[in-house]
Amino acid sequence: GKPYKGGREGRMLWNCVDVRDVARAHRLCMETTVGGNGSRYILSAADRGGELFTWQLQALLESLYPMVDDIGGEPMHGEGGDVPVKPTYDAPRAYCLLAKQELGLETFDLETTVRDTVDSYYAVGLLGDETS
């Protein structure tokens, strides 16, 4: 892939949400007896484990897809190329705790979300052939 050029030179905090969790939360909102008309829920990462800085997302993608030559992302340095060149702003954090508590939302873990997302991109040809 190409290096990500958005944000602060590719550096950002990713609050990862699985679209399947969003769909499930919508269904649970319709079925709940706890929430009422006008109830609001933040559908974001379940906890800190669902938040990654760009360099952490790069490392996860590299571990899941070692056959990809260049994952892209923010510039790295250090002995193993595992230290960001510049620090990333640690953005304010929000989680879907209320949706988990009131609706009983059970979220997909981050690795499953990332793997299933990338695998779906390969399946529809957005990333070419997974073996190349």
Report each predicted region and the residues it spans.
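Mid/C-terminal beta-alpha module of Rossmann-like enzyme folds, strongest
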Residues: 24-82, 116, 125-132
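Alpha-helical substrate-binding/gating segment
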Residues: 1-41
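Conserved C-terminal active-site "lid" loop/helix of NAD(P)H-dependent oxidoreductases
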Residues: 19, 79-104
